[in-house]
Regions:
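Conserved SGNH/GDSL esterase-like catalytic core that processes O-acyl groups on lipids
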Residues: 115-192
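Membrane/wall-proximal cationic-aromatic binding patches
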Residues: 36-133, 300-304, 324, 345
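Hydrophobic membrane-insertion alpha-helices, especially the h-region
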Residues: 15-32
Length: 345
């Protein structure tokens, strides 16, 4: 019986290459239609140093003192951002003079929601609170992309003596606290002393960690299949620490409360963006620890008209939030007792 003629080796190689290319193209198309990865549309400059920030040896970065006219891709014109000393954003036309030390102090800590991302100085929550209460000194320590852990470090640095301390908490801070891949991902290698500080729980104790960020691979920016491989690699690398993010975050909130109370102050958590189950869990936790909180579980929180295009609070939402946190908890006359101060209209 005659044997059938075998195809040339070159033909087999070519066929396999064509099959591989077609399969890769098909996989790319499926990932493209599925919108994967979500970070594909992130700013290609992410990881570079914005002018309004400077590196910090403990916090990773903080607001740089000065006045900045910033332009945003989805907004017309520019936004005036004024930063004072100590990494604070302005809450008044002039930075408080030395005699302000004799007035009750209100500190606001958090991420870009507190800082006032894409908002002018006068549209931010702390500025609005300052206008409602001219008899106190309000400080805005909110900083873009901060985690609860960085707010904890900032409280350790700046809260000395009695003060009313507010921390605006979003549920996505949990991932940042444990350095999940979504927070660490950068397109540009961080330089100039910038880094991502995070913490891990070891035998119940906080252990400080630092990361330069996870640089997106060159091919990940061009092939979604490669991006998927990098995604799973980063998820596996971070799994051990991210799985404990809820416990870690709750530990941070307890320590923040302890620091403020040790200084004879009052600590309050503002529960902002989170799912109903997350909100329920954090309410239960804060109540069990006797930590004061303001729950923003209101219909207005879901109103897209009160948000900027990227989801940050607008001035209108900040005006509402300033009402929701009333009566303002203020430590008066450097006494360890906190009392409510009525809103001034």
């Amino acid at each position: 019986m005659a044997h059938s003629k075998q195809p040339r080796r070159s033909v087999l190689v070519a066929a396999r290459l064509i099959t591989a290319v077609v399969s890769l193209a098909g996989a790319e198309a499926m990932l493209w239609f599925g919108g994967y990865p979500r970070w594909w549309a992130m700013d290609p400059q992410w990881g570079t140093t914005p002018p309004e920030y400077q590196s910090d040896s403990i916090l990773g970065w903080q607001n740089r003192a000065g006045r900045f006219n910033l332009a945003w891709p989805d907004l017309s014109g520019t936004t005036l951002v004024t930063n004072w000393s100590q990494g604070r954003r302005a809450t008044a036309e002039q930075e408080p003079a030395g005699d302000a030390a004799n007035r009750p102090r209100v500190f606001s800590f958090g991420d870009s929601f507190v800082q006032g991302y894409q908002l002018s100085d006068s549209e931010t929550l702390p500025w609005i609170v300052q206008q409602r209460h001219p008899d106190v000194v309000v400080s805005n320590f909110g900083t873009g992309d901060y985690a609860t852990y960085q707010s904890y470090l900032a409280i350790k640095r700046w809260v000395h003596g009695p003060a009313s301390v507010y921390h605006l908490f979003n549920a996505f801070h949990e991932g940042r606290n444990a350095a999940d891949p979504n927070w660490l991902r950068v397109y540009k290698k961080t330089r100039g002393g910038f880094f991502f500080p995070y913490a891990e729980l070891v035998a119940g104790d906080l252990q400080a960690r630092k990361s330069p960020g996870n640089l997106v691979w060159y091919l990940s920016r061009r092939l979604r299949t490669v991006a998927m491989i990098q995604d799973y690699r980063d998820i596996l690398e971070s799994y051990g620490r991210v799985r404990n993010k809820r416990q870690l975050t709750q530990t941070l909130l307890m320590k923040m409360n302890q620091i403020v109370r040790t200084e004879a102050g009052k600590f309050t958590v503002i529960l902002f963006d989170m799912s109903p189950p997350e909100r329920k869990d954090y309410r239960k936790f804060l109540e069990s620890q006797s930590i004061s909180f303001v729950d923003c579980d209101r219909p207005e929180l879901q109103d897209k008209k009160l948000r900027l295009p990227d989801g940050h609070p607008s001035q209108a939402l900040n005006e509402l939030l300033a009402q929701w946190i009333e009566p303002l908890q203020v430590v008066m006359d450097y006494s360890p007792e906190a009392r409510s101060v009525p809103e001034r209209r």
